[in-house]
Structure formats: C-alpha cells, structure tokens
Amino acid sequence: HKKYLEKMIENGNAYVSKEEAKDGSGVIKEIVRFKNPNIDVTFNDLIKGEVTMNTKDLGDFVLAKNLNEPLFHLAVVVDDFEEGVTHVIRGEDHVSNTPRQILIQRAIDAPTPIYAHLPLVLGPDKLKLSKRRGALPITEYQKQGFLPEAILNGIAFVGWNPGTEKEIFTHDELVEAFDLERVQKSPAVFNETKLEWFNKEHMNKLPYQ
C-alpha cells in the first residue's frame, strides 16, 4: 500500500497532514489525506442503475494513519486492484463508500470494477437483521434440520425472483437462473415461515430410504 500512497502524494492526489492526536495526548501525527477534487462521481450499479454523488461533503478524507498504516478505503481499493477483482457485490449500506473508492482508483490508475449494491435484508419487524435482534446464523438452521439446498433456495428468493412461477431450485438451477439485474431495489424481508416451506419441499424431493 505504501507505494500507492507515495504515488498519490507525488502526483498531488494526496498529502501528508500534521495533526494533533484525538486522544488529547498532544502528540502530533503525520496522517495522509486524499486531496478531494469536489466533483460529481457517476457509476453504473447493476441493481440501482446510474448513481451520481458529489464528493464535496466528503472533505479531504484520511487514507492512512501514516505511510505504513493504510485505512479501509485505500486498503480495499489496492487489494481489489492487485487481486484483479472485476465485480464488487455488497450491501447498499456501502453505496456511500463508492465515490471515495472511485476517486482513489482514478488516482492510482486502477480500473473501476462493476458494482452491485444489494438491498438490505430486514426482519419481520422491518428492521435490519442482526444478532442483537435475534437473527440466527445459517449454521443454526442447519442444526435445526434445514437442508443446505433449502437454505440456499430460500435465501436466493429474499429480494430476488426468476421472473417465472417456479420457486423450487437445485443449486445448479439457481446458478443458471440467478441474475443480479432481477434483484429488487427495495429492502427485502426475511420470512422464516417461507424458509420452512422451502425446506419441506426439498425434503419431499429426497429419495425414499
């Protein structure tokens, strides 16, 4: 990551800023900030379509604590670039991160990957699923006897549909049918009763022993 920071500083896209530590110790630290051009950044999202965001409100955001300690935005951009990542598929709560990352991509001459921001998955209370609100990990459903293919089938239908009446899919059929462009834009609600139905249907397809 250091060589990319040095490149951005050399090109005028970033600069070293001497700032007092926020812990009140009075220590002066040399952090690296991105020189924000305050422009509109537009990208095409496979789910949301064309998205335009102005970077003015982002300010000169921090890239690294110092030349040897990169922070999140620089790290993910560099890692994705060096690993040849072509698609970034993540939750829509990361949409606001995208302009920063595109600015960094341009500054280090990295291609911008194709983005797809998935809608959040909500619980029956219409709040974001989380452990604190009782959401179970997939492994817990497996312990309760849910078949892996039923879990996969059920999760695939949370916010997506194939455009047909067919609901029961095998793993291979889902791979063939799944298309990010058919993922809904609004948040999806996880329905455990529906997952139980998927499990029952997959159970019925098991060979009799």
Predicted regions and their residues:
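Active-site cores that bind ATP or allylic diphosphates and position pyrophosphate for catalysis
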Residues: K3-K131, P137-I138, P162
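Catalytic adenosine-cofactor/nucleotide-binding cores of aminoacyl-tRNA synthetases and other
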Residues: S96, I108-Q209
